[in-house]
């Protein structure tokens, strides 16, 4: 029986913090316990925010933390052709359509409505969809207006039917076991933009398949996004990994530790004399 394959996939748009350490260590410990392999992937598809110095810091921090990975490092920025092939396939199957509305356009439309506007699991207003009239933009958008390609969710679900995935961790509400996917909750998600070959959802699904990942271990804030990933796997005929979502570390205000809220970086803790064993204790106590 082939060895299980896990992966840790940070984005080099800032320094790693305790939340990243939790995810890296959970992946490392689970891979070791299963006599499996741990891969390292750098999710740098957003070249406007990702920087080489942050990638170098990630490698340094993981080495200091004692997290060892197998094989080379896959960088999304070097594999645009892999994602473009998938986008082209979905276009050829009439599952994608061009969309010119911006997030602010959609938010403005949602604010004009009298009834509550539907929102995705992250709280973002849903796009009107392929079959609903769009009142804010002219039929022919102005020059230079960037287009996105959205998934026709209704048509995609009609092709795949009901989908499920196996959860060995727990979602935000304690969801575990066999989970029914609910991709419809996300509406017509953007899968490609003018300046990006593919969205996070496409890139992560393609990468996991090409790298032979059998176990996806990540924070429970991505639990509901798994429904989109499960749908793409079905549309593309890809193997479905086992999913394991772990808890998040929160700050004093109850918010998820993140780069945007300036969570203390691992390198700062290291400079203060904190050891890798201390990091494990801090995580256990959080």
Model-found features: residue ranges?
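Short, Lys/Arg-enriched charge-dense amphipathic segments
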Residues: 59-69, 89-102, 118-138, 262-277
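Non-catalytic terminal extensions that flank enzyme cores
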Residues: 1-15, 33, 38, 65, ...
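Short, surface-exposed acidic
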Residues: 70-72, 240-243, 277-279
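N-terminal Rossmann-like or analogous alpha/beta NTP/dinucleotide-binding catalytic cores
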Residues: 1-116, 217-221, 225-238
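Active-site cores that bind ATP or allylic diphosphates and position pyrophosphate for catalysis
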Residues: 104-257, 265-270
């Amino acid at each position: 029986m082939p060895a299980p394959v896990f992966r840790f996939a940070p984005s080099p748009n800032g320094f790693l913090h305790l939340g990243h350490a939790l995810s890296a260590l959970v992946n490392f410990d689970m891979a070791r316990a299963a006599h499996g392999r741990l891969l390292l992937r750098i999710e740098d598809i957003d070249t406007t925010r990702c920087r080489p110095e942050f990638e170098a810091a990630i490698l340094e921090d993981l080495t200091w933390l004692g997290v060892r990975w197998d094989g080379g490092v896959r960088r999304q920025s070097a594999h645009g052709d892999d994602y473009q092939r998938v986008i082209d396939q979905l276009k050829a199957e009439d599952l994608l359509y061009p969309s010119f509305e911006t997030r602010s356009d959609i938010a403005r439309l949602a604010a004009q409505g009298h009834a509550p506007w539907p929102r995705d699991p992250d709280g973002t207003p849903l796009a009107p969809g392929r079959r609903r009239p769009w009142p804010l933009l002219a039929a022919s958008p102005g020059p230079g207006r960037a287009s996105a390609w959205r998934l026709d969710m209704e048509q995609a679900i009609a092709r795949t039917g009901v989908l499920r995935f196996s959860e060995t961790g727990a979602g935000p509400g304690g969801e575990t076991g066999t989970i029914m996917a609910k991709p419809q909750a996300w509406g017509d998600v953007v899968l490609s933009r003018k300046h990006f070959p593919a969205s996070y959802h496409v890139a992560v699904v393609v990468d996991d398949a090409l790298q032979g990942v059998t176990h996806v271990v990540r924070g429970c804030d991505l639990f509901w996004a798994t429904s989109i990933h499960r749908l793409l796997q079905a549309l593309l005929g890809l193997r479905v990994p086992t999913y394991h979502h772990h808890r998040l570390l929160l700050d004093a205000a109850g918010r998820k530790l993140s780069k945007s809220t300036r969570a203390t970086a691992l390198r700062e803790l290291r400079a203060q004399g904190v050891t890798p064993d201390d990091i494990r204790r801090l995580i256990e106590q959080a």
